[in-house]
């Protein structure tokens, strides 16, 4: 299933809609407890000025597949800005809170405000996946299926603590009546 909206974090959505397309895909059901969605951004600025896109980051880890290399973006605390020129696309996986931890043996806190090569976390298969994604710009369903396959091959055993944290964060995100931390108790 696709979700065609630009999302909550995209600043200046009117300008963004004229410069980029953003499509979201649901992950395979077996990955849904780890990955909230995949996102694909495409642009064609050939013959046009570069477009600077600003995004308010969500408190999530992302696997980002793009030229020249795949990266893992840790939870950021600042505005994300990307200059888009020429023609291109980027495919990402937005992990749920607590959903990335089972895929790595390092503390997720070590990734905070950092961008690291995906191969450091996932091994050399991440570079091969990145090459496939960059070559496969046309078939969006196939790209999402390829990322599904990559992550399914690395699916960890369930982590009860991560699942509990994810449930708590989801409750907080969905609760419109919460305004103080002590209301969670």
Language model features with spans:
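Short, basic interhelical loop/turn and adjoining N-cap
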Residues: 185
């Amino acid at each position: 299933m696709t979700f065609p909206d630009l999302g909550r974090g995209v600043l200046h959505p009117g300008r963004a809609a004229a410069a980029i397309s953003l499509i979201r895909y649901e992950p395979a059901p077996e990955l849904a407890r780890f990955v909230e969605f995949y996102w694909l951004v495409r642009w064609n600025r050939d013959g046009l000025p570069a477009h600077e896109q600003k995004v308010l980051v969500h408190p999530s880890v992302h696997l980002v597949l793009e030229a020249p290399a795949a990266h893992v973006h840790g939870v950021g605390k600042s505005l994300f800005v990307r200059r888009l020129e020429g023609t291109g696309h980027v495919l990402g996986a937005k992990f749920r809170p607590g959903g990335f931890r089972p895929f790595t043996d390092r503390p997720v806190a070590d990734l905070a405000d950092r961008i690291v090569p995906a191969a450091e976390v996932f091994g050399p298969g991440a570079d091969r996946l990145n090459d496939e994604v960059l070559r496969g710009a046309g078939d969006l369903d196939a790209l999402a299926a390829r990322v599904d396959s990559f992550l399914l091959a690395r699916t960890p055993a369930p982590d009860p603590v991560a699942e509990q944290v994810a449930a708590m964060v989801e409750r907080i995100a969905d609760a419109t009546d919460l305004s103080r931390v002590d209301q969670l108790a």
